[in-house]
A protein has these predicted regions:
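A generic structural motif
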Residues: 1, 25, 78-82
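Glycine-rich phosphate-binding "P-loop"
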Residues: 13, 17-33
């Protein structure tokens, strides 16, 4: 969604079943949104009940923690934080994810562990440990 999308365009998207805007922030995966666009877009979609779906390298969460936390709409972070190099539950970036979840306005998908796991199936012990920590 371009930041300059009209209200009519948003209404049309909502009528078609759209309920959120995806921010794809993983390097070399398109980066079709800019971090500076997050707040203006969030202000526009919050009254519609939409959410931001955020895909980023979780190792950068601490850099964007304040920005993410202040959004007026729900923010859903993909894939157990999508730490492109798996981290431990003691990592500062994982601590940032946990603080964001504590706000009550940020959610995380416990999905697609295969995308970042280095230990692999069937247990995905590295990324699985993060998911286990989050559900405790």
């Amino acid at each position: 969604m371009p930041p300059e999308a009209t209200d009519e365009a948003l209404d049309s998207l909502g009528q078609a079943g759209v309920v959120g805007v995806r921010f794809q922030m993983v390097p070399n995966s398109g980066n079709i949104m800019a971090w500076d666009d997050m707040s203006p877009i969030a202000q526009r979609i919050a009254p519609l009940g939409w959410n931001i779906n955020l895909q980023l390298d979780g190792r950068t969460l601490a850099d964007y923690e304040a920005l993410i936390a202040r959004q007026p709409c729900r923010v859903v972070i993909d894939h157990v934080g999508k730490f492109l190099e798996p981290v431990t539950p003691l990592d500062p970036a994982f601590a940032a994810l946990r603080r964001l979840l504590d706000t009550g306005n940020v959610w995380v998908k416990l999905s697609a562990m295969y995308e970042t796991s280095r230990t692999g199936a069937p247990e995905y012990r590295d990324v699985g440990l993060l998911a286990e920590t989050l559900v405790r």
